[in-house]
A protein has these predicted regions:
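Conserved substrate/cofactor phosphate-moiety recognition/catalytic segment
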Residues: 23-76
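Walker A (P-loop) ATP-phosphate-binding motif of ABC ATPase nucleotide-binding domains
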Residues: 10
């Protein structure tokens, strides 16, 4: 059954590897013909065939922003499938050139032991979890957040039903008039560029 989304959405997924981000993103676009997914890891691999951080992370994120804004201009809601571990990256992905867009940061919450088990099953070890621990930040500021638990398929389905209800709602606390952009897009872009330079000199 499809999702009858109300309004235009820019949704950013943030979560550890194997937390269910891609499954959620693909579910959203499968159930709504006016949703489009941008996969950060897939774009990075397509351009450079490299794991993060690749040789030009700023180019990757600049292209993501351009694709996002082009899709929004064509009246497609966007879901950005990313790890987005820090607040500058989250803010960059949430800040659109187009106004009157519902912004939403979905934090994928999975218990650590479940994350470790899934990563060992997929990659053979839990090094990815440890690596992202060093960069992970709690969200701050006036950021609309939906916390999505995904420890099991039953829990995933329960939270997906809640998310679907939100997206179909006429009135919700994530409307653009209830939130201000803390910085213009140009300034957020510069902040991300500086962050990436420090991380990958």
């Amino acid at each position: 059954m499809g999702v009858a989304v109300k309004g235009l959405w820019n949704i950013v997924l943030s979560g550890y590897p194997r937390s269910g981000k891609t499954m959620l993103a693909k579910r959203l676009i499968a159930e709504n013909q006016y949703f489009a997914r941008i996969g950060v890891d897939e774009l990075r691999e397509m351009l450079f065939n490299e794991a993060p951080p690749c040789r030009d992370e700023f180019l990757v994120y600049s292209m993501i922003a351009d694709m996002r804004d082009s899709l929004l201009e064509k009246s497609y809601s966007v879901v950005i499938d990313s790890t987005a571990p820090d607040n500058i990256t989250r803010q960059f992905l949430l800040t659109t050139r187009r106004k009157r867009v519902n912004r939403l940061l979905i934090m994928l919450n999975v218990d650590r032991e479940v994350l470790v088990e899934r990563n060992i099953e997929k990659f053979g070890d839990a090094s990815a979890v440890v690596a992202w621990d060093k960069r992970w930040q709690k969200p701050v500021g006036d950021v609309p957040i939906f916390r999505f638990k995904s420890n099991s398929m039953e829990e995933f389905e329960s939270y997906y039903a809640r998310l679907k209800e939100l997206l179909e709602s006429e009135m919700h606390p994530f409307k653009p008039e209830f939130h201000r952009f803390p910085m213009p897009f140009r300034d957020v872009r510069e902040a991300l560029k500086n962050l990436l330079k420090k991380r990958n000199p």
